[in-house]
Design a protein with these regions (language model features):
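Noncatalytic, beta-rich nucleic-acid-contacting surfaces in large DNA/RNA-processing enzymes
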Residues: 1-172
Length: 172
């Protein structure tokens, strides 16, 4: 409700944000999207990949691009890192931290900030959504809401007939 979506991209981001990893960032996203809070400039590489999401890592692809661009980690290894975080493979995670931090420091980022960013990536990547899934769910959600708003009787008839064999669900 606080997001006040004005375009499909807002619904796409909402789908990705409502996950355990990035969920804590919803208030900041909404505030920045609606112009109540300025988007902070962190580093040109991070800013480039998070511009469309108001300075917040929302999609797995953004995280991979940041790991690649800032940490000088090849994209295939960035993908492997994202998957390792999701599966809690600490050996892979721990092997990539110094690579990422060193790459970020070489690109002008403070070492402490680079470590904090890696920690944020760890928190996000375990639950983050990729953009293509968010797009699919957002389009389906939008179409469903539109049908329910403009053709409520037909929508409810279709919803009931899809659950025809589940009388418990039809009663609620």
């Amino acid at each position: 409700r606080e997001m006040l979506p004005t375009k499909l991209e807002d619904l796409i981001a909402a789908n990705a944000l409502f996950r355990p990893g990035p969920m804590d960032l919803i208030p900041a996203f909404c505030s920045r999207k609606n112009g109540h809070e300025k988007v902070p400039k962190v580093h040109e590489i991070i800013d480039r990949y998070t511009e469309e999401t108001h300075g917040i890592m929302v999609y797995q692809e953004q995280v991979m691009q940041i790991v690649h661009g800032l940490g000088d980690i090849p994209l295939r290894d960035a993908y492997t890192l994202i998957k390792a975080i999701g599966k809690k493979k600490h050996r892979v995670i721990n092997a990539n931290r110094p690579k990422f931090v060193n790459g970020a420091v070489q690109k002008g980022m403070d070492e402490g900030l680079a470590n904090d960013l890696f920690d944020l990536i760890l928190k996000f990547a375990g639950y983050g959504f990729n953009k293509s899934h968010s797009v699919a769910y957002a389009v389906l959600s939008y179409q469903t809401a539109w049908l329910k708003a403009h053709y409520p009787a037909a929508f409810m008839a279709a919803a009931f007939s899809s659950d025809m064999d589940n009388t418990d669900r039809l009663e609620t």
